């Protein structure tokens, strides 16, 4: 590749070339890699819309996942892990070709045999595919309650809390359709936010999406209303004819439709009562909620109840979900009701940062070892092994040349205790353990160090 010293070199690398990191689920795609030359060295930057997690950020990230698993375990949900790429047809049929996701946001590729795949742009359709393929819907498994954690890929404009590769916490339930379950599902979301201590200033907005002839009548009325506008965005113009409900979810013109016909005016008495009863039960459980008649979801498969947990101050959605009672059958399975929700981990991390909330436990070492001689190196490794076998968190720095550097490393790593291993301590078998909090020093034989750290006599 020819280079110009005064210009940045940009090279497009094939979409098929990628690297996968198991934790925290990062698939870095060389979709638009920038390579530039500086002082004779080439540097490759991460793709636009992705991020690297390390140190405190990765600890907080893992803590969010752990708290999610903790709450889901209390609600008796089991984890499911599906592939990161699936057949393109799964999302065309499942999500709907009128959705932004399918029409313009999917990362698509064709394998060597001409099969069309996509990096998964959402988590529900793959879960339904797994349910059907593995026959998890048999009667003794129902209701089937599961959750997933993993990366999602959408080609959209990166912005605060929104990436082209982002990560979702998702909840799915199959084989049950009732007001009580809807309330429990929403209370699950509330429990997770409470576990993270970010449930303040949050309200649940909800609506009920009608179906059948009622929906057809409503869509005709909505089209009449929308045809009064002569300045709708190009996406809305397309959606009016493909899936008119999606116009209400438009990110550009959505705020224009406050006076749009209300769906409940066309709903059956049964559907109205279900929405109102769900609302009343949430209030009785202390979950703040309101009915938003213009709330629709960005995915075509939703039916019945839809909801969003929104921050009152920022108007940002934190959790979004609802019912999709036709999706299993549409993807080739039995007629089975389903519901769930999803949460973006990046959005959660942004909220935690804004509110200065830490969810990870304080990261401290039980012991930091300072080796001051060649003979001390072996004893240090011996003590490290014994302590770690006893489930103690211990460390050293093999580059240490003096006490000052050792104490500096121990302080940086927030070690509770420090032990120095030098020639004198080796010869006498007396080792001084310093408690960093109290400042007290305890003299011990080598064989007693681990027992002391474990609180044993």
UniProtKB/Swiss-Prot annotation:
GO MF: ATP binding; histidine-tRNA ligase activity
InterPro entries xrefs: aa-tRNA-synth_II, aa-tRNA-synth_II/BPL/LPL, Anticodon-bd, Anticodon-bd_dom_sf, His-tRNA-ligase, HisRS-like_core, HisRS/HisZ
Coiled coil spans: none
Record's GO cellular component terms: cytoplasm
GO BP: histidyl-tRNA aminoacylation
Key words, A-Z: Aminoacyl-tRNA synthetase, ATP-binding, Cytoplasm, Ligase, Nucleotide-binding, Protein biosynthesis
Listed Pfam families: HGTP_anticodon, tRNA-synt_His
Subcellular location: Cytoplasm
Keyword Ligase among UniProt keywords: yes
Catalyzed chemical reaction(s): tRNA(His) + L-histidine + ATP = L-histidyl-tRNA(His) + AMP + diphosphate + H(+)
EC number: 6.1.1.21
Main location: cytoplasm
Family matches, as SUPFAM superfamilies: Class II aaRS ABD-related, Class II aaRS and biotin synthetases
Subunit structure: Homodimer.
Record-given protein name: Histidine--tRNA ligase
